[in-house]
A protein has these predicted regions:
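Juxtamembrane boundary at the C-terminal end of a transmembrane helix
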Residues: 372-387
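Membrane-interfacial helix-loop-helix connectors in multipass membrane proteins
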Residues: 258-272
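Transmembrane alpha-helical hairpins and terminal membrane-anchor modules
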Residues: 273-284
Length: 387
């Protein structure tokens, strides 16, 4: 059953991604903003599918074959591998500039790093008792400590071991040194990250900056400096501001008490967990947009030539096929609005907003929710039967 489930996950993922990309293929000669608008919902759905489809297949096996199905964690593992493998052809089609073997390597590394986190989280839920007691509290504290350690240093350490993080080239070191001196912002660590996407990250708690090699390939020194100024602006955030970003952790941490919550409160307890997890991303996005707008303003103030930062932003969005406008607010303001705020009139009209996900993304999410409700009801019935 495990092999069959994994193969089904891979085939199903490949099929729905291929079908969803048809509008994007037809727009290959259109402006990049239109191609990005059509690609974005497919990307979001594909990312959701990495955990939604394994959840659906695992819960379906538990409900249909409760005695014959493999352990649920093995089902999650097999279907997660299959879903990830089924996503590779889409990545290669959209970004053909990257050799297939390189996409495969980065996919495997990314999957291992991501699954390590989920393995700890799911194991903690499995080991949790049915009641609130000292054991459930110890498990919660242990996972929280591991999460803090992983966030501060663990994922970089793992990335180094897998060859994902490399020492920064002299070109990048000089740019960061110059911008840091001009903004009076010290940087503790600087890393070059191997990625198919052009991105940069700042970690205020560890004063760490990360730039991808793709970003260095497509941007000039002045444009890299402008992006660097934006990331350094995050390093100047007040503690209360960047600690607010950790509100996102509250999406996941309460689920460590899934078993005692459902055991005591049944379906109502499960729905409370779902509603809290659904509400927090909106709060997080609002916090993030405020801090991103602040960083945009500081980057514009630090640019040497007017328009450099806006030009760099536009090139990043175009290269990554990210939409200029989205239907729902995300963690960053719309690119079109960011360009206008930077004092530049975009060389394209304001495009239509990209959809938040695909039609099948909504269907799969709904199916997962329905299966979870049925599974919770069955679990509560079993607990009441044996107690």
């Amino acid at each position: 059953m495990l092999i069959g489930a994994g193969l089904f996950a891979a085939g199903f993922t490949f099929a729905i991604n291929w079908l969803a990309l048809i509008p994007w293929r037809r727009a290959k000669d259109r402006h990049w903003t239109e191609r990005a608008r059509l690609y974005y919902p497919v990307l979001v759905a594909a990312k959701m599918n990495l955990w939604v489809l394994p959840a659906i297949l695992t819960m379906s096996a538990l409900l249909l074959w409760p005695d014959e199905s493999p352990h649920w964690m093995l089902m999650v593992l097999a279907t997660a591998i299959g879903t990830t493998a089924g996503t590779v052809p889409m990545d290669h089609e959209v970004f053909p500039r990257t050799p297939l073997n390189e996409i495969l390597r980065l996919t495997v590394v990314g999957w291992l790093i991501r699954f390590a986190t989920w393995f700890v989280f799911l194991s903690a839920i499995a080991l949790s008792p049915d009641q609130f007691n000292s054991q459930s509290l110890i498990i919660f504290v242990a996972v929280l400590a591991l999460l803090i350690l992983w966030n501060r240093r663990g994922w970089v350490w793992a990335g180094q071991k897998f060859g994902l993080f490399l020492p920064p080239p002299e070109r990048l070191q000089n740019i960061v040194r110059d911008i840091g001196a001009g903004m009076n912002v010290p940087v503790r660590e600087l890393w070059l990250m191997h990625s198919v996407r052009a991105q940069a990250y700042a970690m205020p708690e560890s004063r760490r900056l990360v730039f991808t090699d793709r970003l260095l390939q497509i941007l000039s020194d002045d444009e890299i400096a402008a992006i660097c100024a934006h990331e350094m602006a995050h390093l100047t955030e007040a503690r209360k501001d960047y600690y607010q970003r950790y509100v996102l952790w509250l999406m996941f941490l309460p689920w460590l008490f899934f078993k005692p919550v459902v055991h005591l409160f049944g379906l109502f307890g499960y729905l409370v967990l779902v509603c809290s997890s659904a509400a927090l991303p909106r709060l997080y996005r609002g916090i993030s947009r405020k801090l991103e707008s602040r960083a945009d303003g500081m980057a514009k103030a630090a640019e040497r030539d007017p328009g450099t930062y806006a030009r760099a932003l536009a090139r990043l969005y175009e290269d990554n096929l990210m939409p200029a406008v989205t239907a729902k607010q995300t963690t960053h303001p719309h690119l079109y609005d960011r360009l206008v705020a930077a004092g530049v009139t975009p060389d394209f009209p304001r495009p239509a907003a990209a959809a938040s996900t695909t039609w099948y993304g909504h269907i799969l999410a709904g199916a997962m929710g329905a299966l979870a409700v049925v599974l919770v009801i069955r679990l509560t019935e079993q607990w009441h039967l044996f107690n």
